């Protein structure tokens, strides 16, 4: 954002987003005069309309699937509308939830593909880092300049950990997706579950079309609504034996959390809805 957006400019973003991204948009970028314009994740018509009507637009930021609802947004639609826009905003995709094995934003026309390297790429919960990919070397050069000045540079040890894990990332992620699929299917019809959110179980035709066009696998993240709300959620977390109650994803251990009081705790109740 700091590389490609300046005070007085805007970016369109799909909502909801990861809690840390929400904090960045509202608590860090906004005071600098960089305005985020939210649109509901999965609403392709609204996405197109908002991009076409927004002035001083520098970026379209798409988090898909959304954290934690797993609602998918149409990357191709965002790219098409951005290319039509007179100001030619960049399209950036936070691909953390799908990772490099399940979804390929650059192949779909996005300018930037963003990852939390802490998750699938590292795979063992023993480092923190981030990765931004781009086809255009000029974009990479601009990002490198900002990174150097802001100090966002990984230490050599973390770089070694990350590069040593990459050869097995596809194998790890494919197994994780298969395991998640089995769990999601086993939970269908459970009397204590109100709703299951998992890409292979989508019933909305629009979501199915997006999934089939841009995802190779359903991924390894499952979200649930439980009868009984927050109380039931915490009782379930306390009762887990194999899953650990912690935030993160993509590592060898299985994790579960209550987003409203963890990753998205800074958001208002209305925002969490």
What is each stretch, according to the model?
Residues 1-192, 197:
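Conserved PLP-enzyme active-site core in the AAT-like
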């Amino acid at each position: 954002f700091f590389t490609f957006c300046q005070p007085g400019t805007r970016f369109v973003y799909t909502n909801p987003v990861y809690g840390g991204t929400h904090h960045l948009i509202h608590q860090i970028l906004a005071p600098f005069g960089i305005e985020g314009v939210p649109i509901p994740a999965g609403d392709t018509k609204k996405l197109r309309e908002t991009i076409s009507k927004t002035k001083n637009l520098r970026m379209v930021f798409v988090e898909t699937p959304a954290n934690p609802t797993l609602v998918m947004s149409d990357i191709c639609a965002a790219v098409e509308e951005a290319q039509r826009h007179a100001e030619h905003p960049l399209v950036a995709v936070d691909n953390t939830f799908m990772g490099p094995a399940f979804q390929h934003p650059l192949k779909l026309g996005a300018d930037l593909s963003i990852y939390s390297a802490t998750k699938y790429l590292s795979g063992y919960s023993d480092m923190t880092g981030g990765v931004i990919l781009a086809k255009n070397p000029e974009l990479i050069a601009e990002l490198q300049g900002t990174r150097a000045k802001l100090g966002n540079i990984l230490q050599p040890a973390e770089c070694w950990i990350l590069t040593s894990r990459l050869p097995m990332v596809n194998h790890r992620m494919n197994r994780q997706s298969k395991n998640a699929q089995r769990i999601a299917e086993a939970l269908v019809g459970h009397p204590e579950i109100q709703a299951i959110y998992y890409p292979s179980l989508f019933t909305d035709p629009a979501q199915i079309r997006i999934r089939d066009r841009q995802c190779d696998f359903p991924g390894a993240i499952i979200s649930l609504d439980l009868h009984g709300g927050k109380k039931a959620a915490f009782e379930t977390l306390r009762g887990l034996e194999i899953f650990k109650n912690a935030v993160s994803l993509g590592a060898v251990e299985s994790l579960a959390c209550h987003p409203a009081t963890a990753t998205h705790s800074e958001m208002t109740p209305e925002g969490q809805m």
